């Protein structure tokens, strides 16, 4: 009980401090602050309610006694990850709490296992040792330090123990104080940003030093240099006398005292030192009705040392004429987009009137003695690839606004950055009302200045003495000059006859060739040689869309677009017409059976043919080029013959009951059957043998996937083939015509194709030659036995079942 009473006594003692909100003072001085205005304070009732909710959640998660079973900070961290904080946040009816707020309040303040307060020497040593072991993995580090969370460990190391904060405890010099004040002017109270530019000064140290400076200035204890630096950029007139240490009320900060009252305050302080309730910070008359003047370097700061009343919109004068080309604007004399800013006499005046100015925009340094009159001449002839005479203009075009208007707009935002209201500022009364509302409800005001300059393009254009063109900057409707892109001129212009160096335009012949090139490239069979993708050792007459003539380019010169094309596509200049065997060339010359070099394996790179050998009309050069670019190891898999042979061999070596079709060599059989089936169109193939008569249902299962015209290609199924191979005297299946029994029977070999030249694998067969020989020998044996059996059946009229056979598979 004594401990609890001691804590209560400590809490009951008044806190020693300045008695005023330093952030409010900073804001009143005109500095930008980044306060979390939407933060909700936690009362004792809210804390007790959160404790009970967490205790109930712990019991639901398996802790029988609730929080009493949570002994370590690691267990607390595990518990906090399992609790549904969004559900707990909905239990707070009177205040708006998010799941993040509830979780942060528990883990950062109310957790009984959380250790708060100063770090001991032992904890610092443990932190340094854990950092050497784990690095910046703060969760692992917190596991080695009991009672400290990962956030506490990270903050302690970065702010105090890290190498970047070794000099944080050294004395602040006057130079550092002034540097800190300038950083706060530039960035506001973004302490991490400020500390990144301060040597060995962590963010926490910078914040504490700023608070001390403000406190000393308010109390009159700061030096004249610091006080002047603080007040230099602001519109608040602080008292010269020493300020007392009495707590400053909000009404005192927002006091509307007059200069006469300020003098009375100074006299009263001298005459009556015990006066305690007087204004400490005095604002000049009509503070809220004064419009802040924007400076060049400070950006949109709402205060100035010399306040200026808001002028009526009608009295705002238009900015002076600007005789320069700004970034992104269009030059009226030549329709040339320029990024060159001309030095003018009134540039400083223009920057004063425009917020921010364009001083930081990229500029191009001009040569000495360069006047604005030669801007167009400089732009037309600098970095040019031509030696054409320079264009001189008789007059200088200036850009003067026809009309200008200025608008002041405001946006009122709450603490969370959400827009509440916005509109146009048209009176000082509205400004005063905005300031009062912002102070009353802790709102933010954003002021925007909009200057609208309306320019009129001049109708008269200077005429060039050489070309007589009214618009020298426009070439074929394109506002971009070739001079503005010298690298493009080097790529397209060197050695190309279409680019005329005198006029920097495309002649009609070259323009026609470009149009043809586009149409060829987008056609069904594009002509890739228009882009010089292939070597040019062939006759130039074969390619009508080639850029330029052969006299202007060497044969082995690198391509404009693909310089490495010659190394990828070597020229096959020794090809002749006789090298293409028409018997082996199918409709698609990309087939692996296409022998381009007298039976040798076709090359994967040599793709060009001579002028006399024409490709089949349905094969476009794009398909040939695509095939020739493939590696040699992939090319054999693209042909239909190799894929079919590989699939048939796989089915033959690994049969399955579901495979009911036979894919033998069908090319010759189809030709023979067509000659026979032409006489019997209505006949259907019925498969018979001496062991079993297959009924109509079995025939329907062995038909092909296509319609009846393709049924003559189908043979027996796998089980019939297996039975015929297992018998001592097997009879091969015979196809007979249903209408004409006297027709010549035709033997069908299941799954075994005759080894002919058309179906051979050629040079790509590889390891399949051995299997093909075995299959061919078996096919010849079955063929001879089939002839003997057919002759025996015709003479004897039938035979008995004497051989041992496999039972019929009912499936």
Swiss-Prot record:
Subcellular locations according to the entry: Nucleus
InterPro entries assigned to the protein according to its UniProt record, in alphabetical order: Homeodomain-like_sf, Myb-like_DNA-bd, Myb_dom, SANT/Myb, SANT_dom
Compositional bias annotation for Low complexity: 265-275
PROSITE patterns: HTH_MYB, MYB_LIKE
Record-level GO BP terms: positive regulation of transcription by RNA polymerase II; regulation of DNA-templated transcription
Annotated ranges, domain Myb-like: 34-110
Pfam families referenced in this protein's UniProt entry, alphabetically: Myb_DNA-binding
Quaternary organization: Monomer.
PANTHER family: SNRNA-ACTIVATING PROTEIN COMPLEX SUBUNIT 4
Protein name listed in UniProt: Myb-like DNA-binding protein BAS1
Organism: Saccharomyces cerevisiae (strain ATCC 204508 / S288c) (Baker's yeast)
């Amino acid at each position: 009980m004594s401990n609890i009473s001691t804590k209560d006594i400590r809490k009951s003692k008044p806190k020693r401090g300045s008695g005023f909100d330093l952030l409010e003072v900073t804001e009143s001085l005109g500095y930008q602050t980044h306060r979390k205005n939407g933060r909700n304070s936690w009362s004792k009732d809210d804390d007790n309610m959160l404790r009970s909710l967490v205790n109930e959640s712990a019991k639901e998660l398996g802790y029988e006694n609730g929080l009493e079973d949570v002994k370590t900070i690691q267990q607390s961290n595990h518990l906090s990850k399992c609790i549904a904080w969004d559900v707990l946040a909905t239990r707070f009816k009177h205040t708006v709490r998010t799941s993040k707020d509830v979780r942060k309040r528990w883990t950062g303040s109310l957790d009984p296992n959380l250790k708060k307060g100063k770090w001991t020497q032992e904890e610092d040593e443990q932190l340094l040792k854990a950092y050497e072991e784990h690095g910046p993995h703060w969760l692992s580090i917190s596991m080695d330090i009991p009672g400290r969370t990962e956030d506490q460990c990270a903050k302690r190391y970065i702010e105090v123990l890290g190498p970047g904060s070794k000099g944080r405890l050294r004395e602040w010099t006057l130079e550092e104080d002034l540097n800190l004040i300038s950083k706060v002017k530039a960035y506001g109270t973004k302490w991490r940003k400020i500390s990144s530019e301060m040597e060995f000064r962590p963010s926490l140290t910078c914040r504490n030093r700023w608070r001390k400076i403000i406190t000393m200035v308010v109390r009159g204890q700061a030096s004249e240099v610091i006080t002047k630096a603080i007040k230099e950029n602001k519109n608040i007139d602080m008292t010269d006398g020493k300020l007392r240490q009495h707590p400053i009320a909000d009404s005192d900060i927002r006091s509307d005292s007059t200069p006469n009252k300020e003098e009375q305050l100074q006299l009263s302080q001298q005459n009556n030192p015990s006066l305690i309730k007087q204004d400490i910070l005095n604002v000049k008359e009509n503070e809220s009705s004064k419009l802040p003047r924007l400076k060049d370097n400070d950006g949109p700061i709402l205060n100035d040392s010399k306040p200026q009343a808001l002028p009526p919109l009608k009295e705002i004068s238009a900015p002076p004429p600007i005789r320069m080309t700004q970034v992104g604007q269009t030059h009226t004399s030549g329709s040339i987009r320029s990024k060159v800013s001309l030095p003018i006499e009134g540039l400083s005046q223009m920057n004063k009137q425009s917020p921010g100015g364009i001083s930081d925009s990229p500029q191009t340094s001009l040569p000495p003695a360069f006047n604005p009159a030669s801007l167009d001449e400089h732009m037309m002839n600098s970095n040019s690839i031509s030696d054409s005479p320079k264009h001189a203009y008789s007059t200088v075009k200036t850009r003067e606004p026809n009309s200008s208007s200025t608008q002041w707009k405001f946006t009122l935002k709450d603490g969370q950055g959400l827009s509440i209201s916005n509109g146009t500022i048209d009176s000082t009364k509205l400004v005063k009302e905005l300031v009062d509302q912002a102070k009353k409800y802790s709102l933010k005001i954003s002021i925007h200045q909009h200057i609208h300059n309306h320019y009129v393009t001049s109708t008269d254009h200077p005429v060039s003495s050489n070309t007589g063109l009214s618009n020298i900057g426009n070439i074929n409707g394109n506002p971009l000059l070739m001079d503005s892109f010298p690298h493009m001129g080097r790529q397209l212009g060197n050695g190309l006859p279409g680019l005329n160096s005198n006029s920097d335009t495309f002649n009609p012949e070259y323009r026609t060739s470009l149009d043809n090139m586009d149409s060829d490239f987008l056609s069904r069979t594009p002509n890739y040689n228009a882009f010089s993708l292939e070597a040019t050792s062939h006759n130039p007459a074969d390619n009508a869309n080639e850029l330029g003539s052969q006299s202007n380019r060497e044969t082995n010169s690198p391509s404009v677009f693909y310089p490495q094309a010659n190394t990828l596509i070597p020229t096959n200049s020794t090809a002749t017409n006789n090298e293409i065997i028409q018997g082996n060339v199918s409709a698609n010359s990309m087939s692996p059976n296409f022998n381009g070099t007298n039976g040798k394996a076709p090359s994967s790179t040599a793709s060009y043919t001579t002028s006399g050998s024409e490709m089949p009309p349905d094969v476009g050069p794009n398909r040939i080029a695509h095939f020739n670019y493939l590696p040699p190891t992939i090319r054999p898999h693209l042909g239909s013959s190799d894929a079919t042979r590989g699939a048939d061999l796989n089915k033959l070596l690994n049969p399955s009951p579901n495979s009911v079709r036979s894919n033998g060599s069908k090319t010759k059989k189809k030709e023979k059957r067509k000659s026979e089936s032409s006489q019997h169109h209505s006949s259907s193939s019925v498969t018979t043998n001496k062991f079993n008569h297959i009924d109509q249902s079995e025939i329907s299962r062995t038909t092909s996937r296509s319609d009846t015209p393709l049924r003559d290609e189908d043979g027996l199924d796998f089980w019939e083939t297996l039975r015929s191979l297992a018998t001592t005297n097997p009879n091969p299946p015979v196809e007979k015509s249903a209408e004409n029994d006297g027709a010549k029977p035709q033997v069908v070999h299941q799954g075994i194709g005759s080894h002919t030249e058309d179906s051979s694998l050629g040079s790509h067969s590889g390891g399949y030659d051995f299997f093909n020989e075995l299959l061919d020998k078996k096919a010849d044996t079955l063929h001879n036995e089939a002839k003997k059996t057919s002759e025996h059946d015709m003479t004897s009229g039938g035979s008995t079942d004497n051989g041992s056979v496999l039972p019929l598979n009912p499936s």
